């Protein structure tokens, strides 16, 4: 120590300690400020995100309330004041339905054309009726012909044959067609021209449409006609704005909170992202896009009431002649609602006479449900009461309207896909 020369004396140690203390204090102040900003950011995201979640949930509840029928109609026995295609759309607003809306709309519209005598539908391929004028044929005679020939009985389950009747070609204005029915008939007439005959089955339709480059335009024409027809009812209004915007903002705040904190605090990041994502997913899954207007409440009441009445048809003891007269239209709207198979069973429970082929040939040959029940004579089913679910609800066509609903739906889906595939790539397909 004696060998070290002291150059200058002073309080350098105290100064160094003071400097280090100041630096430490600045660091602590910076950390405190950073923590305060982080907490403030959490609070801002939490408050704004929570507010958006509350607004989104309120919007979802409100949209669901507006999409609910609040009137007093429990059962409705007459045709609704809307076309079958519009009924297929409207029932989706207020109730759960089986099958795609576009498919149900097409099927119900075709059946409406059958009721209005613009079309006729027969089981089996068109070749099975070669030499027969189906525009004048009696359904009972055709049923007896099929029953007497096992090969025809077998072929009857393979497809359906459509017949464009003469009045649809020459006196269409007398049929009282709606916009959607007119567009559907025009589509079928165009297809029949490509087939080369007013009598054609789905296999022929598919083959004829496989190279129809402009076919998507006719399909779009039908889809647009359905949309315009429904818009003109003024039955619904858009209520999605009540929940879509706050739902998106809530999810955005959740993502921001997660990204900001994922590197420093995984628990907080998951709380933000997970909670807001769950709320957003819930709102996206349960929010309704369309709510009923005042007139929409009336139309919805009629559709829901008719659906309930048809589903409970066999429970009513006061059925009368009106129900039999209306049954053709019941089957049309059953297809629009996606309940054809159930309604066919209900009618069979209420009127066991349909199990008797002779009774059907005498009194039911001109009804839309004739082939539903008559086909069981050649399919080995003598009664309806013990029918399996597959007989009405399966994909196989057995000559019945209950099954023809599925068959027409499947057939037109296939034809639509064929038309879309034939469309030029720039057209974007049929959309229908």
Language model features with spans:
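Acidic, Ser/Thr/Pro-rich intrinsically disordered cytosolic tails and loops
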Residues: 1-432
């Amino acid at each position: 120590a004696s060998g070290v020369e002291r150059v200058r004396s002073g309080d350098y140690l105290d100064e160094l300690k003071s400097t280090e203390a100041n630096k430490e204090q600045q660091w602590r102040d910076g950390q405190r400020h950073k923590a305060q900003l982080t907490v403030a950011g959490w609070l801002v995201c939490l408050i704004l995100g929570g507010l958006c979640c509350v607004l989104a949930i309120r919007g979802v509840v409100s949209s669901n309330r507006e999409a609910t029928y609040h009137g007093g109609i429990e059962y409705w026995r007459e045709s609704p004041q809307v076309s079958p295609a519009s009924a297929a759309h409207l029932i989706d607003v207020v109730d759960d339905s089986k099958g795609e809306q576009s498919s149900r709309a097409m099927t119900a519209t075709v059946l409406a054309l059958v009721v209005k005598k613009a079309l006729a539908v027969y089981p089996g391929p068109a070749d099975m009726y070669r030499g027969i004028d189906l525009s004048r044929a009696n359904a009972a005679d055709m049923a007896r012909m099929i029953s007497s020939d096992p090969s025809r009985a077998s072929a009857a389950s393979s497809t359906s044959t459509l017949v464009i009747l003469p009045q649809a070609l020459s006196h269409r204005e007398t049929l009282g067609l709606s916009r959607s029915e007119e567009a559907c008939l025009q589509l079928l007439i165009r297809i029949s021209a490509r087939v080369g005959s007013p009598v054609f089955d789905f296999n022929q339709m598919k083959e004829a449409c496989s190279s129809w480059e402009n076919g998507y335009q006719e399909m779009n024409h039908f889809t647009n006609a359905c949309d315009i027809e429904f818009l003109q009812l003024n039955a619904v209004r858009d209520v999605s704005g009540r929940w879509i915007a706050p739902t998106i903002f809530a999810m955005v705040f959740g993502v921001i909170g997660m990204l900001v904190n994922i590197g420093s605090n995984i628990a907080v990041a998951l709380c933000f992202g997970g909670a807001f994502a769950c709320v957003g997913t819930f709102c996206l899954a349960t929010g309704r896009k369309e709510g009923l207007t005042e007139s929409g409440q009336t139309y919805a009441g009629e559709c829901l009431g008719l659906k309930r009445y048809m589903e409970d048809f066999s429970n009513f003891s006061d059925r009368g002649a009106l129900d039999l007269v209306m049954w053709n239209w019941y089957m049309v709207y059953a297809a629009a609602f996606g309940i054809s198979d159930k309604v066919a069973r209900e009618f069979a429970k209420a009127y066991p006479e349909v199990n008797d082929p002779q009774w059907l040939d005498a009194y039911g040959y001109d009804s839309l449900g004739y082939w539903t029940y008559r086909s069981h004579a050649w399919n080995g089913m003598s009664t309806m009461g013990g029918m399996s679910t597959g007989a009405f609800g399966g994909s196989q066509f057995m000559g019945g309207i209950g099954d023809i609903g599925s068959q027409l739906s499947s057939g037109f889906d296939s034809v639509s896909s064929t038309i879309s595939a034939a469309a030029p790539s720039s057209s974007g397909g049929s959309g229908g």
